[in-house]
């Protein structure tokens, strides 16, 4: 099948959130299944020097009253084809924000539609989040191109109808209130990035005022869990980690822990319980819960906390004040640093994700891969990926709580701290977490089933029986299943 993915991000070149990881890592797994998969993204300024871009455009056209060109490049790691939409509105390196954000992405969607109609015509055009939301609306006219729309975060919904009517030429059948609603209404298939999130967004609590529409289209809505690139994220080969380790030599993690403590200004003591967090510092991620419980936790236990990220200034200030009040025990770096994030995954004892909502979450998968035990709220993709620790039955992969309340989060933190003191049991917990496999293999099989379904292809694909061989979290190594 010919499949074109359209998105605002593509890792590792352009990445802000989980969407970039999906768009960058899903194509190689689909290509292994025999499909011709390509990606189209805006031609942001820095991409022209990062990628080997064709000298001449492969396509030129005019849309929304302005000319644009499409150039061809190759993904720097996986070598599949990437198309860049060239236009002065994308010349800066800024991805989101700005006064013309709505126009920029509506223009990108229109340019992508023109490209798909007139240059490289896919059988499936896979659109990601509101930035590409107008594509299913336009493609609804073309019976030869099927559209799939993936919801990465329902909270961000794009420009409203009145603004779209001014920017586009087809307001008369725009029944949705905004880009996200229009995409869900007109796409042939819709998926969320985890099964639990697909169910949650049909409720008032998580539906962001779209629960009515989501229930209306529930027949074409499904949840497909994201994965991670197991080659890129491998603690046994990670060049960034000072000490490489695997499930068979966990003692090497202690060296990473000491270096992490030193780099973040914490007391260097491997016996201390070290909690890590790598996140956007926003309400969605539950940073306000961390602010509410940290003082009590640090008073009651000998824990240390290391936070890496940027975001809301109020939350940043609260974390900074904690670092001033608890030197050597609480540290925050208000930036994003890939090397330091890997060190946190590979050196912390546990990883914090007390999210208000979490469509899928990638960080908990990386934490488990690197032996850091996730402490999560049971919501969205965290429900699908982290199993509650049960010391009596030696099962589970993390610590979970249900209500978004400080006392519930605090209780999970204390439970994890007490579990950490039982070293043999903790080591088994780490091994269970590290033995989980959330590769893109199963996700790609599920996407393939959806693609063939939407195109009406009846020939057998690796169907449900084949997919079941790769149950979520199942280890590829049979020897690890008994841990």
UniProtKB/Swiss-Prot annotation:
Top-level taxon: Bacteria
Q: Which family does it belong to?
A: Belongs to the glycosyltransferase 1 family. Bacterial/plant glycogen synthase subfamily.
Enzyme Commission code(s) on record: 2.4.1.21
Q: Which pathway, metabolic or otherwise, does it act in?
A: Glycan biosynthesis; glycogen biosynthesis
* BP GO terms, sorted: glycogen biosynthetic process
InterPro entries of this UniProt entry?
Answer: Glyco_trans_1, GS/SS, Starch_synth_cat_dom
- Residue sites binding ADP-alpha-D-glucose per the record: 15
Residue stretches spanning the membrane: none
Q: Which UniProt keywords apply?
A: Glycogen biosynthesis, Glycosyltransferase, Transferase
Which EC class heads this enzyme's classification?
A: transferase
**One GO MF term, please?**
alpha-1,4-glucan glucosyltransferase (ADP-glucose donor) activity
Q: PANTHER family in the record, alphabetically?
A: ALPHA AMYLASE DOMAIN-CONTAINING PROTEIN, GRANULE-BOUND STARCH SYNTHASE 1, CHLOROPLASTIC/AMYLOPLASTIC
> What catalytic activity is recorded?
[(1->4)-alpha-D-glucosyl](n) + ADP-alpha-D-glucose = [(1->4)-alpha-D-glucosyl](n+1) + ADP + H(+)
Q: What is this protein's record name? A: Glycogen synthase
Report the function annotation for this chain: Synthesizes alpha-1,4-glucan chains using ADP-glucose.
């Amino acid at each position: 099948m010919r499949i074109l993915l359209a998105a605002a991000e593509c890792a590792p070149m352009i990445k802000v959130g989980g969407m970039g990881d999906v768009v960058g890592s899903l194509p190689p797994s689909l290509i292994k299944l025999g499909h011709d998969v390509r990606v189209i993204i805006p031609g942001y300024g820095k991409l022209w020097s990062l990628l080997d871009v064709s000298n001449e455009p492969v396509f030129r056209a005019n849309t929304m009253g302005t000319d644009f060109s499409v150039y061809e490049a190759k993904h720097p790691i996986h070598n599949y084809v990437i198309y860049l939409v060239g236009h002065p509105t994308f010349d800066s390196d800024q991805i989101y924000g700005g006064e013309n954000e709505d126009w920029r992405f509506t223009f990108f969607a229109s340019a992508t539609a023109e490209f798909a109609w007139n240059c490289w015509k896919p059988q499936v055009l896979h659109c990601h989040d509101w930035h590409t939301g107008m594509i299913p609306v336009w493609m609804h006219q073309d019976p030869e191109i099927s559209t799939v729309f993936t919801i990465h975060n329902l909270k961000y919904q794009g420009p409203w109808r009145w603004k779209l009517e001014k920017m586009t030429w087809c307001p008369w059948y725009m029944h949705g209130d905004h880009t996200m609603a229009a995409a869900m209404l007109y796409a042939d298939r819709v998926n969320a990035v985890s099964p639990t999130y697909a169910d949650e967004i049909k409720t008032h609590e998580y539906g962001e005022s779209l629960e009515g529409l989501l229930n209306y289209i529930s027949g074409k809505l499904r949840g497909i869990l994201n994965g991670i690139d197991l080659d890129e994220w491998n603690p046994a080969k990670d060049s960034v980690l000072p000490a490489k380790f695997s499930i068979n030599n966990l003692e090497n993690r202690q060296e990473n822990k000491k270096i992490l403590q030193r780099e973040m200004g914490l007391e260097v003591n491997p016996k201390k319980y070290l909690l890590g967090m790598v996140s956007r510092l926003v309400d969605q991620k539950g940073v306000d819960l961390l602010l509410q419980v940290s003082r009590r936790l640090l008073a009651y236990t000998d824990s240390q906390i290391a936070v890496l990220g940027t975001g809301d200034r109020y939350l940043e200030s609260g974390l900074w004040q904690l670092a001033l009040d608890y030197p050597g025990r609480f540290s925050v770096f208000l930036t994003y640093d890939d090397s330091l994030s890997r060190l946190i995954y590979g050196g912390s004892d546990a990883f914090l994700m007390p999210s208000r909502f979490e469509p899928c979450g990638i960080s908990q998968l990386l934490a488990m891969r690197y032996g850091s035990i996730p402490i999560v709220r049971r919501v969205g993709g965290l429900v699908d990926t982290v199993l509650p620790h049960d010391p009596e039955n030696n099962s589970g992969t993390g610590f979970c709580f249900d209500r978004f309340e400080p006392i519930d989060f605090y209780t999970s933190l204390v439970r994890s701290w007490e579990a950490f003191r039982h070293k043999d049991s903790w080591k088994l917990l780490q091994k269970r977490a590290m033995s989980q496999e959330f590769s893109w293999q199963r996700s790609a099989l599920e996407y393939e089933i959806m693609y063939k379904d939407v195109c009406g292809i009846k020939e057998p694909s690796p169907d449900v029986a084949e997919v079941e061989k790769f149950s979520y979290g199942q280890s590829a190594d049979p020897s690890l299943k008994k841990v």
